[in-house]
Amino acid sequence: MDSCEEECDLEVDSDEEDQLFGEKCISLLSSLLPLSSSTLLSNAINLELDEVERPPPLLNVLEEQQFPKVCANIEEENELEADTEEDIAETADDEESKDPVEKTENFEPSVTMDTYDFPDPYPVQIRARPQVPPKPPIDTVRYSMNNIKESADWQLDELLEELEALETQLNSSNGGDQLLLGVSGIPASSSRENVKSISTLPPPPPALSYHQTPQQPQLLHHHNNHLGYQNGIHQITSINSAASSCSSPDGDSAFGDSSSTESSNNRCRNSAFSSNDSCRDSLNTPSPTQVSPRNGELNAEEAKAQKIRQALEKMKEAKVTKIFVKFFVEDGEALQLLIDERWTVADTLKQLAEKNHIALMEDHCIVEEYPELYIKRVYEDHEKVVENIQMWVQDSPNKLYFMRRPDKYAFISRPELYLLTPKTSDHMEIPSGDQWTIDVKQKFVSEYFHREPVVPPEMEGFLYLKSDGRKSWKKHYFVLRPSGLYYAPKSKKPTTKDLTCLMNLHSNQVYTGIGWEKKYKSPTPWCISIKLTALQMKRSQFIKYICAEDEMTFKKWLVALRIAKNGAELLENYERACQIRRETLGPASSMSAASSSTAISEVPHSLSHHQRTPSVASSIQLSSHMMNNPTHPLSVNVRNQSPASFSVNSCQQSHPSRTSAKLEIQYDEQPTGTIKRAPLDVLRRVSRASTSSPTIPQEESDSDEEFPAPPPVASVMRMPPPVTPPKPCTPLTSKKAPPPPPKRSDTTKLQSASPMAPAKNDLEAALARRREKMATMEC
């Protein structure tokens, strides 16, 4: 009983303390809040306190007669508490096993200050973060114009010849129909014979007027009807001025077709329209710098730009997309080429090799580099170059390289290193022995790639994986399967159920890393990246970074990923590359020594086509002709024209023992003995031989191309007249000698030292000392 009374007293004291503490808190909050807010707070609290009935004090409820009965009930409840715990646990388990039913018991919520939401007098406005729009796709027109702007004059001449060849095919009866049907008029496998035949045409005149254009009147008429020029005036726009005045020139006047670009790449539809409309007026309206001040006459560059625009209009009719691309070589030099959208990488490599006189090998390739992403990859020969370029974003610093990569087809020359895995024997028979012959290798590679389907080498092992959003690397167990690349999130060797697909190879490409040790803190430089082909963003869901422990592991994984991506097309590309090499090097290897002089005579013509080193060609031709035909002369003709050009035409007479060659050299000034020009004495000997030779007929001789007559002997041996010395104005007189110097006194007089005895060597000094010593001993 006493314990019950003490508990009741403690409860009463605690209730009073809580009430006093609550009142103090309310008063403190009212003083801190503004007047309006404190009034609302106090009214709300009082209203709720009135609604809730406060229980009366315990001593007022319990009467003296009922107090013992209440204490007895409390003791009974304490005794029965332990007995009812097990029953309560069993009923709870039964309720959980049954279907959940919503409880509808009406409980009175407790009154707390958290249930009141007061309006904020100064609400904070949270603005949504603006989304960064993605970069627009590359504009092929602008890309081509930028490459042309940096090209040299001889490269522009080559481009003009290619466009003229295409224009000639479009004007023909069958060429236009073939291009409209999607058949290339200039096959990629053919040589540049048509282009060379067009290059023999006379060059365009240095100046053309708007109304006096004799070449191709039908082209101008068609061009005016399509572009809507008024009064039949064809407005000319130079390439350099168009590239500098507008960053995105019109698709009708540059190296591509806007309509064909839309059909091949729908992503750039809106950006192409906006860029074309913004620059249409600037291209159709000639600026004062584009038209020369001589009454509508054009200079040589504007005439070339006119021809290029005319040929491109014909390209538009054929729905052909061409991009002027720049390829870099290992020494930094740029090779430029106009690429058709239907050309594969193999066709582009062949055109580059033929244009630049390079012996094409199987390991020649085109390498694509992404400087912003620090990755690069080798284009496969069956891919389309134009399609890959159209996936770039605008103003991207991406580059294309033309180089040799021995690792391109290393898995064909060494299949025992790259294609063999512990599970290869489950699918096919493995040859015995470590040293495989060439026949065994070819047979194994053929069987490997002619399976259906082609299964890549099932590579397994530990590789480093870069964490998303951090420059930390963790080692995981990777497994390569035909469906994609899998890894285990846990570092230990997993089972099949623990593998997770990292990337599939259906819509992704395999790249290699560049400088990841400095950029991403990679543990080794042997890095592989798997990226979505159509996107160029540094996001973890689009690009994955993997690193191998050593170089051989890196090469094996790279080959396996390429086979999983491309399959049997790799072997087809290799066989086609070997066929192109045999076609290119076959005629050169069968050339005899008797026809070597003919080959040498063709070298200057090819060099003049590029206008690179005419002096080398001239020296080769002069020396070879003087050595092979010492009795047959050469007619050397010099013109004071610019630019310097060099051409050789060799012809044979009816008599087999007599041949003649006509050499035409055009220089800016008279020939001298510099490295760029033939020596003067050689030219004089050749000229004397040509004047005294009766083999050249009168029809081929031209008085304007001969050397002038030598000067007369008198003018050469003329001596200058003697020059008489001038007479002096005043007579010459002899000069007087200066007075002698005064005598010095004895104090200041220089005194010479006493003469020294002649110097003695060591032997003489020793002998003298010995004689003196012996003389003293005798005394």
Curated annotation (Swiss-Prot):
| Record's compositionally biased regions (Polar residues) | 189-200, 256-293, 645-660, 688-698
Keywords, A to Z, come to: Developmental protein, Neurogenesis
Name any one GO molecular function: SH3 domain binding
Q: Which residues form the PH domain?
A: 456-566
Q: Where is the Ras-associating domain?
A: 317-407
**Which BP terms does GO give this entry?**
axon regeneration; cell projection morphogenesis; egg-laying behavior; lamellipodium assembly; locomotion; mesodermal cell migration; neuron migration; presynapse assembly
Residue ranges for the region (Disordered) are 78-105, 189-217, 242-302, 645-763
Return the PROSITE patterns for the record: PH_DOMAIN, RA
Its subcellular locations are:
Perikaryon
Q: Which Gene3D superfamilies does this chain map to? A: Phosphatidylinositol 3-kinase Catalytic Subunit, Chain A, domain 1, Pleckstrin-homology domain (PH domain)/Phosphotyrosine-binding domain (PTB)
**Which branch of life, at top level?**
Eukaryota
Q: Where is the composition biased (Pro residues)?
A: 708-729
**Do you know which CDD domains this protein is assigned to?**
PH_APBB1IP
State where composition is biased (Low complexity): 242-254
Effect of a null allele: Defects in axon guidance in HSN neurons although axons reach the ventral nerve cord in the end. In max-2 and mig-10 double mutants, the phenotype is more severe resulting in axons failing to reach the ventral nerve cord.
Q: Where is the composition biased (Acidic residues)?
A: 78-97
GO CC entries: filamentous actin; growth cone membrane; lamellipodium; neuronal cell body membrane; perikaryon; presynaptic cytosol
State the similarity comment. Answer: Belongs to the MRL family.
PANTHER family named among the record's database cross-references: GROWTH FACTOR RECEPTOR-BOUND PROTEIN, LD06925P
Summarizing the function annotation, the protein's role is: Required cell non-autonomously for proper development of the excretory canals and for the long-range anterior-posterior migrations of embryonic neurons CAN, ALM and HSN. Plays a role, probably downstream of ced-10/rac1, in orientating axonal growth of HSN and AVM neurons in response to guidance cues such as slt-1. May regulate growth cone polarization by promoting asymmetric F-actin assembly. May be involved in signal transduction during cell migration.
Outline the subunit composition. May interact (via Ras-associating and PH domains) with ced-10 (GTP-bound form).
Query: How is this protein named in the record?
Result: Abnormal cell migration protein 10
The scientific name of the source species is: Caenorhabditis elegans
